[in-house]
Amino acid sequence: FIFPISTAAEKNYNKKPALMWFDATANFKRLSYPDSIDYYLDKIKKLGFTHTILDVRPICGEVLYKSQYAPQMTEWNGFHRPDFDFVGYFITKAHQLGLQIHASFNVFVGGHNFYDRGIIYTTHPEWASVVYTPDKGILPITELKNKYSAMINPILPDYQEYILNIFIEFISKYPAIDGIILDRARYDGIMADFSNYSRLKFEEYIGQKIENFPNDIYEWQKDSKGNFYPKEGKHFLKWIEWRAKNIYDFMSLAKEKVKSVNKNISFGVYTGAWYPSYYEVGVNFASKNYDPSKEYKWATSEYKNFGFRELLDLFTVGNYYSTISIEDYLKNHPMIKNETDFKFQQGTWYCVEGSCKNLKKILDGYPFYGGILA
């Protein structure tokens, strides 16, 4: 399985870059031999791609190289990879072909719930995000077996130190890498994170104790059809704002640490393209010049201060829609529910063309790469 990313419109480019993403686990066996790496890199070069994105830290928190901080993934689904410098070979071959190569890290995740595998199952269960569910109350995310990615609470200081050390180690180990891209640098969803630590840090942020937690954030209720929905509490909007600030602060710190090792390396981020509901994961990837409070009820007037597009050298999004054009979308108005969404969404944001047009607006002219799954 290969995840290609095609480019959206940009300004001041003679030739638009085109990125091809190689997922770690989907391609674990396929890319376990140098001649296979040669074959696929040669192929994407002939197809006109300019960049390859190599996933080096999948969701279980293992990495695809030898590390003093993270366990190395040497086996997946019963297949054991031969012992060679996978990342080093990929970098060398890509550069021989004139391709840029960027390494992708899944950031705030450390386990695979379908396999009970990963660092939050083995060494750091305390890092697991605590989620507030409609039917089971508050519990660790590792107990939600319908959710494959076991996410981590983004604000834990010891985890932030851990993941930043991984970035620094990787860039030092592979100085020829052209850039890194942060993936899953977010909360799991609207249900995260409701740990005691998050409560205390949020109380510090608003300068008062929460009388009724978690219901002062939101309370699960049922609508007329019997479906659960989060009824907003008195602190809901500040909670949404605070989560966006947390992710912004981490992005700022991560960039600082990365650039301290190599000032010329590209610092990039991948997100979903569905901005109207992406607040659910605590991410404001817009430009600071865009004020979402003028369009969306979930945004405070301060929310715009935590737009992080200006921090990035490279920004890529997933436009994962089966409807391509706005014209086709308007014929049927399909309801769309993306991986991070709590409920179904509707509007021209939820087709490939529409999302790209809307992204241009909120990014204030900054370039982005619009992605498709193939």
Residues of each region from the PLM?
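Substrate-binding cleft/loops of secretory-pathway carbohydrate-active enzymes
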Residues: G110-N113, G118, I181, G189-M191, ...
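Active-site clefts of carbohydrate-active enzymes
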Residues: S224-F236, I265-S287, N319, I326-G347, ...
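Active-site-adjacent "subsite" loops/lids of carbohydrate-active enzymes
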Residues: N12-P34, H102-Y174, S224-L237
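Aromatic-lined carbohydrate-binding/catalytic grooves of carbohydrate-active enzymes
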Residues: L47-D83, L330-H333
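Catalytic domains of carbohydrate-active enzymes, especially glycoside hydrolases
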Residues: D35-E62, P175-D178, N305-V317
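Aromatic- and acidic-residue-enriched segments that line the glycan-binding/catalytic groove
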Residues: L64-N77, V109-K145, L182-G226, E280-S293
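An active-site-proximal structural segment forming one wall of the substrate-binding cleft
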Residues: Y40-F49, K93, M151-R186, N305
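The substrate-binding groove and active-site-proximal loops of carbohydrate-active enzymes
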Residues: F22-L31, Y69-F84, K145-L164, G233-Y248, ...
